[in-house]
Amino acid sequence: MNKIFFYFFLSFGLNIFAHPDSVSKKYSDELAHLPSPLPDRVVLTWNDDPASTQAVNWRTDTSVLKGVAQIAIANSNGRTLNPTEFKAETTYFKSDINEAHYHSVIFRNLKSDTLYAYRVGDGVNWTEYY
């Protein structure tokens, strides 16, 4: 039994050293934090009363001129959602390494103790439902 474990770990260890190109390379800050047309850095938080409002914020590159968010009462299969759409407020932001648009929406009049699903995008390109 010990021989089996020895040979297993030996072959596993040799595989690691046989592929030195699998070592992660360091990207520059400019590339690592580069915004794209697809939404990223999606953050959900509450606004005013957390029982009836939620706020969502996300980032895109500056080619995305409008942001849109959808929210719907969640169901068990996730396919037959009937979302309500909200236009986002879009803000330009310039940092020392890039430029981006930040989008924000406040969902109001939500039912308390109810599970919702939401997604964000530009009306064509969307995140998955969260």
State what each model feature region is.
Residues M1-I4:
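Positively charged n-region of N-terminal signal peptides that target proteins for export
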Residues Y7-N15:
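Bacterial N-terminal signal peptides
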Residues A18-Y130:
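Acidic, histidine-bearing metal-coordination/catalytic regions of metal-dependent phosphoesterases
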